[in-house]
Regions:
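Carbohydrate-active catalytic/glycan-binding domains of CAZyme proteins
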Residues: 1-407
């Protein structure tokens, strides 16, 4: 699997280096000597693009069945005058310049693009601004679409359910979840800028360096960032959790700064290193920003599907779905209980009456993919409205899925 990152020099003008690394497990990474770009008289490096005029380089593997082979890898990047361009490659290493996609946006953040198989079109998310309630310019996320990667729709600002707060959304991190491609997940960076120095900044880690940065712009010392989580099924309306998914963490001289928690694009299933355990999810985010050493990329882990859960205390709780129709002959769940806890699944008709033969009984354990056993034939209920009632005690339910056993 490849990783692309940007490095830059502090020369005038600065050079932006787009670098390539690769891994077979998402944990250990190799930087091959590619011989493409000359740096300080040598091509023994992992730089694939060298430019004075590009930024925000994002690469994706184009899964459009009609994509020409020599365009399988596409990159989107920002060029001067607020233009979003693309580069093209057959192997993900040797890129050539393509064409301008749009000049209707800001584009100076991480612009994400992918082929949506369900919609049969390309989807791009980028940054812009809108006027806030107090006249402040608020960073936001916009969406554009294309069927051919050349002609793009007008930007449309995404909306949020159950989140009335007008947060600054710095990056977006929107992507189809590889375990459920019909669902988008996103890891945007939330930008928070307090407008004046207070006593808390004197107590907060890194105060002296924070004051030094403010010589260049006040926000370089006053702003802090963290990572949020949100999901969507249509790509336009998102459920955004207001609480941080990735906090700045324990105070240290290199934390609690503008630039913390910027999530890299992509999620990877990685082994835990413990025999017999389910894989876990790895994702990556920036740290060590605004220091005298290079920015670092940190790997974080969580359980498969473990972004959110329905959780109940030992006293118990229930989750009842809306009526749904399913295909398949098996139900699998991702769940975790304590030793004394449990989870039980009851299938009901549309009116909420329990169906005979469809009570799982007590389930306990901690598994990302547990098949639920019923005495009844689950396939007989396919394609007719049913409800699922999950009865939990000191337990978490992360996901459930109907499937055809053996497929």
């Amino acid at each position: 699997m490849p990783m692309y990152n940007r490095e830059h020099t502090r020369h005038d003008p600065p050079f932006h280096h787009i670098c390539y690394a690769e891994s077979t497990d998402g944990v250990h990474w190799n930087k091959p000597e590619l011989g493409i770009c000359e740096i300080n008289g040598s091509t023994r490096n992992n730089v694939i693009v060298l430019s004075e005029t590009m930024d925000a380089f994002h690469v994706f593997l184009d899964k459009n069945p009609a994509c020409p082979r020599d365009e399988r890898y596409k990159a989107v990047l920002t060029r001067p005058h607020r233009q979003l361009w693309c580069m093209l490659s057959e192997d993900g290493v040797h890129f050539r310049m393509g064409w301008m996609l749009s000049d209707n946006g800001v584009f100076d953040s991480h612009n994400t693009v992918f082929w949506d198989e369900r919609l049969r079109r390309y989807v791009c998310y980028m940054r812009d601004f809108h006027d806030g309630a107090n006249g402040e310019r608020i960073r936001d996320i916009r969406r554009i679409e294309s069927t051919d990667f050349k002609n793009w729709s007008e930007p449309e600002r995404i909306s949020y359910t159950d989140s009335p707060y007008d947060f600054h959304m710095y990056t977006n991190g929107v992507q189809p979840y590889f375990r459920a491609p019909q669902l988008y997940v996103a890891f945007p960076a939330r930008y928070t800028e307090r407008k004046e120095w207070t006593a808390n900044y004197d107590a907060l880690c890194g105060a002296e360096h924070r004051k030094w940065r403010m010589q260049f712009h006040p926000r370089y010392g006053l702003a802090v960032t963290d990572g949020l989580f949100m999901t969507s099924r249509d790509g336009k309306s998102f459920r955004r959790w207001n609480e941080a998914f990735l906090r700045p963490g324990p105070e240290s001289p290199k934390r609690w700064v503008y630039g913390d928690g910027y999530a890299a694009y992509g999620l990877i299933a990685t082994p835990t290193g413990v025999e017999g355990e389910d894989d876990e999810l790895s994702f990556y985010a920036t740290g060590n920003v605004w220091s005298d050493t290079p920015v670092q990329l940190f790997r974080y882990t969580l359980r498969l599907d473990g972004f959110v859960s329905r959780s109940a205390p030992y006293a118990g709780g229930e989750v009842v779905t809306q009526p749904l129709c399913f295909a398949g002959d098996a139900l699998h769940i991702n769940f975790a209980t304590s030793a004394a806890g449990s989870l039980r699944v009851v299938i009901e008709d549309e009116a909420g009456n329990a169906l005979p033969g469809f009570d799982s009984g007590e389930l306990f354990g901690d598994a990302a993919d547990r098949a639920v056993h019923f005495d009844g034939n689950l396939a007989a209920l396919a394609r007719q409205p049913v409800r699922l009632r999950f009865i939990l005690r000191d337990a978490d339910l992360y996901a459930f899925q109907f499937c055809t056993e053996g497929k």
